[in-house]
Amino acid sequence: MRDLLKIHKLEQKEQDFDAIRVGLASPEKIRSWSYGEVKKPETINYRTFRPEREGLFCAKIFGPMKDFECLCSKYKRMKFRNVVCEKCGVEVTHSKVRRERMGHIELAAPVAHIWYLKSLPSRLGLLMDMTLKDIERVLYFEAFLVTDPGSTSLVHKQLLTEEMYFDALDEYGDDEFEAKMGAEAIQDVLSDMKLEVEAANLRENSLNTKSQTKLKKYNKRLKLVNSLIQSGNKPEWMVLKVLPVLPPDLRPLVPLDGGRFATSDLNDLYRRVINRNNRLARLLELDAPEIIVRNEKRMLQEAVDSLIDNGRRGRSVMGNNRRPLKSISDMIKGKQGRFRQNLLGKRVDYSGRSVIVCGPYLKLHQCGLPKKMALELFKPFIYNRLQVKGLASTIKVAKKMVESESPEVWDVLERVVHQHPVLLNRAPTLHRLGIQAFEPLLIEGKAIQLHPLVCGAFNADFDGDQMAVHVPLSEEAQLEARTLMLASNNVLHLASGEPIIVPSQDVILGLYYMTREMINQKGEGLIFANATEALNAYESGNVTLHAKVKLRIQDYQKIDGKFESSTKRIVDTTVGRAIFSRILPNGLSFDLINEAISKKVVSDLIHVCYRTQELKQTVVFADQMMYMGFQYSTKSGISFCSNDMIIPDSKAKMIEQAKTQVKDIQEQFSKGVVTDGERYNKVIDIWSRTSEKVAKAMMDEIGFEDFIDADGKTQKLASFNSVYMMADSGARGSSAQMRQLSGMRGLMAKPDGSIIETPITSNFREGLNNMQYFISTHGARKGLADTALKTANSGYLTRRLVDVGQDLVITEDDCGTDNGLIMKAVIDGGNIVQTLGVVTLGRVTAEDILMPDSTEVFLEKGHLVSLDDSDKINELGIESIKVRSAITCDTRYGVCSSCYGNDMARGHKIGVGEAIGVIAAQSIGEPGTQLTMRTFHIGGAASASTTISSVNVNTDGVAHFENLKSITNENNNLVVISRSSEVTIRNNKGQEVERYKIPYGAIVHVQEGGKVKAKDKIVDWDPHTHPIISEQAGRVIFVDFVEGVTVNKNTDPLTGLTFFEMIDEAERSTAAKGLKPLIKMVEESDSEVVLSTHYLPSTVKINLDDNQVIVAGEVLAKIPKDLSKTSDITGGLPRVADLFEARKAKDHSILVEATGVISFGSSTKSKDRLIITNSEGEAIEMMIHKWRQINVFDGETIEKGDVISDGPSNPHDILRLLGVEALANYVVREVQNVYRLQGVNISDKHIEVIVKQMLRKVEVLDAGDSSFVNGETTEYVRVIETNKQLEVQGKELIIYQRLLMGITKASLATESFISAASFQETTRVLTEASTTGRVDTLQGLKENVIVGRLIPAGTGFKHHQKRRAQYVASITQTIDAQQALADQLNEAEEQAQEG
């Protein structure tokens, strides 16, 4: 009975666990795993195919080859289970134990484990405080290590060469000291190590040392020693005495035809180890000469090294086909390794794949499934149903019936498939909408039919795409597929909350065509009582589709949640719109569709419908729209021919004008008036403008036609040109493509992004000549190459994002924090990109929002901003709102739903258990792939925007400046001398409506608070050069200006003015060595007082003379700008990657470390010394390279975090000096800029979620009374929790600073070592985890997938919560039950003994 209980307990124990710990295995542990020692290198007998005894496949050690049969076949079948055959020694059991049972090899000499030796930082090196080189010399028998110096003058752990060793022997004798070679020496040192003493010494040393390098080293060692003490790992276990042998079925040996064998590389590597080990054992028995034994030990060490990690040290061991053998490390790492190939990616049963075709008659939740496929996929259900209905007596009969395809099978199939959802998946699955559930309709043929409206979500088209079908088997799986994954339940895009079920292409074309209006049509002016009457009239041929008519319509109002008809009115409309109104759901205003319906209108319609109606109505409406769109696009017969591409008459004239302008500039260049760079920029500018003009002329010509109305007058109306209608409706093509068809192709880009200055003046209708065709090939080729290369990049970015966000799940409803981020409207130049209402929609307020200019509360703290609130916010003109954010959430594991806000894909507050980290990663990664493929479609036509050289405002209002430093020049205009200035325009409500950046050197024509009118020019600048402005009046002195050596003096042929040009450093002669040309500004009266110095780059032009007196605001020098490059996402995707990897840009901006007054100290040879004196009088010094332009002057007061020297921002500095909120705003803004450029809409919250994960770690500056070490990097939440405990105990708190980690680094630094190991650098992660005895509590999604459990998200989240609760309850119950049972058993035993 007790044994039974024991077995029962063991079985339970195996099933349920909450964490996985990894550590170093002791020799005893390895022996305890083992079922026997492998002593021979033989594998199997090549004649009998039986395993050799005590060999690598021995059945006695690893278990039987066949189920329940010993090797000699004495015992067969189940009745002898667990019997050990006395003849061959094999246990009779399942043959699958050959996948589980391990063996071992007793090593004749200890061997160091290569992971702990070579995986950086070397654990052995750290622990023994020796360099890796020294340890290797000992290990590979090149030097002796003193393990016990005795009373000699030798030092512990001293290295001795052979010569030194023998000298020491002669001097001291061999009893006085001990020195050894090989792993044995290392093992001795490690086993003698007393970790507690070592830790105490290290603590003392770190307190006493002044050297930063030593402190770092001590802290590193202390961390390792502490973790060894805490984990119970012994250091000497890093040296192996016993080597475990992998179960044979994990390193199989398969006989091929012709007497050959296919074998796993591991068998070869094990054979080498066993051979060398046996040879060494024999040599030791024979007492062979030391040198031979040493050599054999070294070879054994190398053999074990290559078994564990081949190629890590020295040359790889090659197989017979000249490729390196795959070692144990190779088996687990990389894409083909155990983690990514078998644990995270598994093949799926009950699946099929086929080509997809369009199913225009399907409902949104349906797909067409070929009968042949369904028959195969639903086999088990069919067998069951055939048996239940009594059509087949056994499974065998059912199987025959299905194979012969008898008629009743098809009836059963219909019944089985009815309302049984299947999953459709299209690779690449970039976001969760790449797998959706549909109800199958059985169809003839072999292609899967897909509903056209879900193509957007799958990114599918019908040009040969394939899709896979999966069948959910269990009831629960079917239920989840139906409720969560059915296509009709996934109407919104999870990245932006916009509808994704939007009709496109032909459907849009049909709707657009039917809702266009035309004058002088049959039936014009008729009045219809309702839409059905209009439809009847149209179908009977009494009116045409585009005729202008009057229609009586009904308006609806919402009463008690239902739409009731309220008023009737007559509207002017067309027959087509009247027909379309028949499918409009009650409650949607007719005014929404009383226009030509383009793609945008349709998208808005679905959005409004989803927000005001129920989900079902929206889905039905989308379907109805699709059917109608297809019907009328077929009826319209829209197609196009070459005559539809109208070439504007004015084109030739425009091109001639442009050529003349280019010729003028060319002449100016040949006279030397302009530099080559300026000429190039101007030429590009002319052609860009001309291209735009031609395009505009073409659109005007193609977009309008003359029609004769009923009175015989001519009217210019929107054209019915096919090409125009396709582009205007948004069905096919764009104005950019039309421009190339019938305008001019314009400028082309070279593969490096620079623009070729000869444009293609022809279009595709005229045809290209040889030269133009050749220029075109550049862009076309770049498009294809880009697509191939960038898809991989984008996929890798998504993988890193998923990895960093995978363990972030909504775990509670509200964390109760008051923190949040301040949101403002997004304004770019003269247009509002996103209003404040849109930005805050679906977010929870972090504080009370007041009405403008009053104390009345408009939205209370903790309110979820709804659609109505969002509109109200815009109306009221509120400036900014503080909302809760994932970044500032206080939940321990995960995020609370209040900090996250709305679920983008559902439109209501997010539920507990949603995997927001993965959703965020998919939302950011999915468009990445699309963006990378963007270049390809426009065929490389250059998209250089015409150069902007001024700010012209669009609205009347008041101008305000931000961060503006300026000086007044002699014309009384302001000259800007700050680099991050902006001008904003506010309307009469005080709302900011426009915002522009102002470059350094710009001239401002309006004062702060000055009124401006629309179209006023308020700022202008030279777009082709960067000026250097004099900030004070004074005298100019040239330093190191030597004509012909450092500068050239040239004369402008037009103006006759002379100017200096720098000679590029690379081209200067030796005479220029040590000369650094610069301009000094000194006081006019006293040349000793230096006002400022300006270092000059090599491309500069100077229009001044030496000793010239100038006023403030004058231009000292001009630096020509870089040549125009096209803006393309190629720059965008790496930009996003750089932001998420938190990379420091080269020459990044320098920020002020503290608030205070600036002064300049004595400078060194290459650096300037900047001194900031704060209010307490403390001075902080900063050293800045001399070639950096410094934007501050002596005596200026500046704020912490201000920019001293311009450049790309460094996110680490922003976090350190300006805080988490500033960093969050910076990353969100920069990432959004890249995506917005491509017209992709992503919600800010997804980017915030990733930033939260990047901010997981902190650096401990002062450990206070905690157990942390100064300088240690640890989890933010752990520090917060420890601080709470310390505060309660009244102890000193930890002082820390937040760290920003790139997504790769953050993924590797996650608390879960399983997740990190499956991501990258597997061996390094596992080495670190095992030495520190890491415990993985299986919090994230990845770890749970790997150990084969439900993920703790969605329905799995509840499952794990329930499981934990049950576990706690069962422990208390089990203890009681066990106690009672034990009492009863004791009683029974006592009674039996008495009896």
UniProtKB/Swiss-Prot annotation:
Domain of life: Bacteria
GO molecular function, one term: DNA-directed RNA polymerase activity
Cofactor binding mode and count: Binds 1 Mg(2+) ion per subunit.
UniProt cross-references to SUPFAM superfamilies, sorted A to Z: beta and beta-prime subunits of DNA dependent RNA-polymerase
Function: DNA-dependent RNA polymerase catalyzes the transcription of DNA into RNA using the four ribonucleoside triphosphates as substrates.
Binding partners and assembly: The RNAP catalytic core consists of 2 alpha, 1 beta, 1 beta' and 1 omega subunit. When a sigma factor is associated with the core the holoenzyme is formed, which can initiate transcription.
Entry protein name: DNA-directed RNA polymerase subunit beta'
One Pfam assignment: RNA_pol_Rpb1_1
Residues holding Zn(2+) 2: C815, C889, C896, C899
EC number, as in UniProt: 2.7.7.6
Keyword entries, A-Z: DNA-directed RNA polymerase, Magnesium, Metal-binding, Nucleotidyltransferase, Transcription, Transferase, Zinc
Any single Gene Ontology cellular-component annotation: DNA-directed RNA polymerase complex
Residues annotated to bind Zn(2+) 1: C70, C72, C85, C88
Sites where the protein binds Mg(2+): D461, D463, D465
GO biological process: DNA-templated transcription
InterPro entries noted in UniProt: DNA-dir_RpoC_beta_prime, DNA-dir_RpoC_beta_prime_bact, RNA_pol_asu, RNA_pol_N, RNA_pol_Rpb1_1, RNA_pol_Rpb1_3, RNA_pol_Rpb1_3_sf, RNA_pol_Rpb1_4
Annotated catalysed reactions: RNA(n) + a ribonucleoside 5'-triphosphate = RNA(n+1) + diphosphate
Needed co-factor(s): Mg(2+); Zn(2+)
Family indicated by similarity: Belongs to the RNA polymerase beta' chain family.
Species of provenance: Ruthia magnifica subsp. Calyptogena magnifica
